[in-house]
């Protein structure tokens, strides 16, 4: 039975994670997803993880990460305890530790995973899209867990303003920082004041590229510090 306990009360504060980059979100979310959908292959090898990150379906946005970018993200997530490298295999394999780090049940982890994989969604969309990870009894069950996640300290999700013409509000996860909210252009705005969809897409692509570079540089810094015996904590 789905039950979000104490959904009406603010939960005790937990240690806040730093904001995760897009590639870091994608890596941990793919690990959660594949744990349920391809359990025979879980924990995942780097190659399988890369394929899941670059998957063309059920992903928003679609990315084209390199093996080195995914490995750098894995190294960073290991430092945050969100990913664990499993020993005892010829090939390195990885599993997630999302529920333990965030202190959330499997139902909430499924919701966060779909929000990281597919972007903001309504409660109804989340119920349909989480089917393979967790089967919620009804939409109100999803809403209960969303409310509980929103009441965390710091919050893990946020309810977005309802877009003009939309019947339901969408929810976004906050592990990647505050979501980008589209705002309707004011009436009478000049064409040169409007930003085209292509320009927005280009800016987001540039942002994602820079995030990946930061992750790689951070991983290289930690490796260098380890070699020199320097503590960066």
UniProtKB/Swiss-Prot annotation:
SUPFAM superfamilies: Winged helix' DNA-binding domain. InterPro entries: DUF480 (IPR007432), WH-like_DNA-bd_sf (IPR036388), WH_DNA-bd_sf (IPR036390). Gene3D superfamilies: Winged helix-like DNA-binding domain superfamily/Winged helix DNA-binding domain. Belongs to the UPF0502 family. HAMAP family: UPF0502 (MF_01584). This is UPF0502 protein Mpe_A1449. It comes from Methylibium petroleiphilum (strain ATCC BAA-1232 / LMG 22953 / PM1). The lineage of its organism: Bacteria, Pseudomonadati, Pseudomonadota, Betaproteobacteria, Burkholderiales.
